[in-house]
Design a protein with these regions (language model features):
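Beta-strand-centric surfaces of beta-sandwich/beta-rich domains
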Residues: 1-398
């Protein structure tokens, strides 16, 4: 019988002294499950900075939030319900901290609606939305809230999940790649990670009629206040905990370049990209809801027909093929075994399910352009984008 190599898992049982940090990391990574960190009361249009900084005493994989509350709509139905209501009640989330190598950074600055949609871009199951005890369908095409489901006169007990992954999202078979993006205690200055939430109001859900009233109370109650439950998920890495070269993922959601969607045209530059290692570029298009409170920004509709032949460009050359957005959109969906929701368009560079293939935007020369160009098909469109970037050298990739 031939001599077969001992599987890595069996070698670890006997001790990890002879293994490299990469071998250990590939074998030892067990998540501890969501651990309660903080409970934040909801107040309309408030933007609280959580009084406690995130406890980073173990490698951290994700932050999970749940908005739990009752919304009572009375007087009159909403005349228009926003496409992504009610997850628009959390307007924005900012995560910032001081990294020992990259100094003060903001890894997350995204709208609540985009955070809600994010997992669905990369896996079959997205964030959970439960209305009056009924799990809602996954985001699909189109994305449009039905007023009879939410927006008409009625009482709605809402449980809305917002999972914020700290690593790029890979398929289950490639989950160990997440280890190279965990927030390691030794990489950050003390307990400097700070979370800020930005809350909406009744205009976050759409356009209320003149007689519409909206009351926010505790989940399952006509009194009290809604709450945001915030949990953290840590990983146990064993001997690998202090040996991994961890990268930091940056996701900042921005509006398209001013005026770029105001006129119909071909090959229009709609956004400049940062010259950083890039794992994904996600676009979101539709129309903006008018008449909201000053600090509230909401998509009235999500629409795939605002842009066409969208390209990631370096020096006038596309870095990924795309002749029709519907083909590019469904290619990304096939690669991640999901349905890309209406209005969203993802250009992945890690459909290989490994960070080894991220686009080396950091190697684009100083005088070169790194941008998003597109044909613009309508003069009334609105859009945002997220360039998912990587700082550092995960896996010692250089």
């Amino acid at each position: 019988m031939p001599n077969l190599p001992t599987p890595p898992a069996q070698r670890v049982v006997g001790g990890s002294q002879g293994l490299t940090s990469r071998q250990v990391a590939q074998v030892l990574s067990r998540y501890q499950g969501p651990e309660q960190f903080f409970q934040q009361p909801f107040t309309i249009l408030d933007s609280p900075v959580l009084p406690n900084n995130i406890n980073l005493n173990r490698p951290m994989e994700s932050i999970e939030m749940w908005w739990l509350g009752r919304v009572t709509i009375a007087g009159a139905n909403y005349t228009t319900v926003a496409a992504e209501a009610p997850q628009t009640i959390i307007q924005k989330v900012i995560l910032q901290g001081t990294h020992k190598k990259f100094n003060q950074i903001i890894p997350v600055n995204m709208t609540g609606a985009t955070i809600f949609a994010w997992p669905r871009l990369f896996q079959e199951r997205g964030n959970a939305m439960i209305i009056n005890g009924v799990m809602q369908n996954e985001l699909s095409v189109p994305v449009a809230q039905v007023p009879a489901n939410f927006g008409n006169i009625g009482t709605y007990d809402l449980a809305i999940q917002y999972m914020i992954p700290l690593a790029p999202m890979f398929g289950p078979a490639a989950r160990r790649s997440v280890n190279y993006f965990l927030y390691q205690p030794q990489d950050w200055v003390g307990q400097s990670l700070q979370l800020q939430l930005f809350f909406g109001d009744k205009s976050s859900f759409g356009t209320p009629a003149g007689g519409t009233t909206v009351a926010f109370t505790a989940f399952g109650s006509n009194s009290g206040s809604p709450q945001v439950m915030i949990d953290t998920n840590y990983a146990i890495l064993g001997a690998a905990a202090n040996k991994i070269s961890a990268g930091v993922v940056i996701r900042n959601e921005q509006s398209f370049q001013g005026g770029s969607l105001s006129s119909i045209g071909n090959s229009i530059r709609i956004a400049q990209l940062q010259k950083q290692k890039t794992t994904n570029v996600v676009l979101k298009t539709g129309t903006q809801l008018a008449g909201t409170s000053p600090s509230v920004i909401v998509f009235q509709t999500l629409d795939d027909s605002v842009l066409e032949r969208t390209q990631i460009i370096v020096d006038n050359k596309p870095v990924k093929n795309n002749n029709l957005n519907i083909i590019a959109k469904n290619y990304a969906g096939r690669q991640f075994n999901t349905v890309i929701p209406g209005g969203y368009l993802n250009f992945p560079f890690v459909e290989s399910q490994t960070p080894l293939t991220y686009f080396r935007g950091d190697q684009v020369s100083g005088g070169s352009n790194f941008e998003i160009d597109s044909d613009v098909l309508t003069e009334t469109g609105f859009g945002t984008f997220v360039q998912e970037q990587v700082l550092g050298n995960p896996m010692g990739l250089g």
